[in-house]
A protein has these predicted regions:
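Small/polar loops that bind or transfer phosphate-bearing groups
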Residues: 16, 40-41, 174
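Conserved acidic, metal-coordinating active-site core of Asp-based
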Residues: 98-100, 108-190
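Active-site phosphate-binding/coordination module
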Residues: 22-137
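Asp-based phosphoryl-transfer active-site loop
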Residues: 3-18, 91
Length: 190
């Protein structure tokens, strides 16, 4: 007997239009009517998932940040797996040496050591990777500026103060223009 359906978001739950199809919504409702729980499982931060949950009136739990956080239906963290702050400093020392957009996913949202302009460039690179349906640089810029992830980004001006705060860090994300440099960074972090 099936007790739970857990679905990834991108390319599974949501389609290339970044919406949930009527067919998927009906399947979720049908499963729930049979007593089967539905959950979203994603590498995204919960703050990126919540608008979708609200828009489609989903009543579900969520595993976010590649398993780093588990949320109940009300959006409360039930379980979190976080990175030791000493390890965070080591990771940042390596990541901040290159030409990378560095994002830090925490229990209090996402942060970056980059400037707003650098973050926008990183969001545009990310959009070009994941949203091939856009047709021009102006569409990529418009998409990046309207993205809730960009709008809600927190900017770190003092890394020491940030690390002294009560923030809990679950994940790092980085994007670079050179695949070779990204591979080199990965090797340094291993």
């Amino acid at each position: 007997m099936i007790k739970l359906i857990a679905s990834d978001m991108d390319g599974t739950l949501i389609n290339s239009d970044h919406t949930i199809s009527q067919e998927n919504l009906e399947a979720i409702k049908e499963a729930e009517s049979r007593g089967i729980k539905f959950a979203i499982v994603t590498g995204r931060a919960y703050d990126d998932v919540r608008p979708l949950i609200d828009e489609y009136n989903l009543d579900c739990e969520c595993v976010a940040l590649n398993g780093g956080e588990y949320y109940d239906k009300a959006g409360n963290v039930i379980e979190g797996i976080y990175i030791d702050k000493n390890k965070v400093r080591e990771i940042l020392n390596v990541m901040m040496t290159g030409e990378f957009s560095v994002e830090i996913y925490t229990d209090k949202g996402y942060y970056t050591t980059n400037t707003e302009e650098e973050t926008l460039r990183g969001m545009i690179r990310r959009a070009k990777t994941f949203h091939k349906d856009l047709n021009s640089d102006s569409e990529y810029i418009k998409f990046a500026k309207a993205n809730p992830h960009f709008i809600n980004m927190n900017y770190i001006t003092d890394i020491d103060e940030f690390l002294k705060s009560d923030v809990k860090i679950a994940k790092f994300v980085t994007f670079g223009e050179s695949e070779k440099k990204v591979i080199e960074l990965r090797k340094k972090l291993e």
